[in-house]
């Protein structure tokens, strides 16, 4: 497993540079011009013990869609690459997180197959310039490019900010479990097939 990676993604719509360490301590720095997005990413980093340094410029004069989507694509690709053959990792992670009146569960499988499912209240409205519906776009593209199963269930809750924050915090916690090394099987691929994509 690689410890540090620095990758870039540049299109006619976005210019992104991401420094990522899955075996970090939760240190992060963001420069995206989208404050709410940075706030959500900080929860993945902090609770996943993932170091992230993200610089992003996008066509936010139109909206934030391309910026959020392309960040998810790059982050997902880097997670998949950094995990390598996935030898020794737990592979699975799940976390149920309470945040005041909200209760959210996130479950992941880093087994190499994409699936995304969200169950919960509609994510709509805006947080500054960030459209709330972009959270689902981010999660779907992250799962697709990391080649993982990602299930998100918001069991109940009302406050829109709490709902979003609980999703990203629980995602960080679930990823932390899944990428952790299983010391009882550190030289084994966590699959009866003997390999994972």
From Swiss-Prot:
GO terms for cellular component: cytoplasm. Pfam families: IGPD. Keywords: Amino-acid biosynthesis, Cytoplasm, Histidine biosynthesis, Lyase. GO terms for molecular function: imidazoleglycerol-phosphate dehydratase activity. Pathway: Amino-acid biosynthesis; L-histidine biosynthesis; L-histidine from 5-phospho-alpha-D-ribose 1-diphosphate: step 6/9. It is found in: Cytoplasm. InterPro entries: IGPD_sf, ImidazoleglycerolP_deHydtase, ImidazoleglycerP_deHydtase_CS, Ribosomal_Su5_D2-typ_SF. Its EC number is 4.2.1.19. Belongs to the imidazoleglycerol-phosphate dehydratase family. HAMAP family: HisB (MF_00076). This is Imidazoleglycerol-phosphate dehydratase. It comes from Leptospira biflexa serovar Patoc (strain Patoc 1 / ATCC 23582 / Paris).
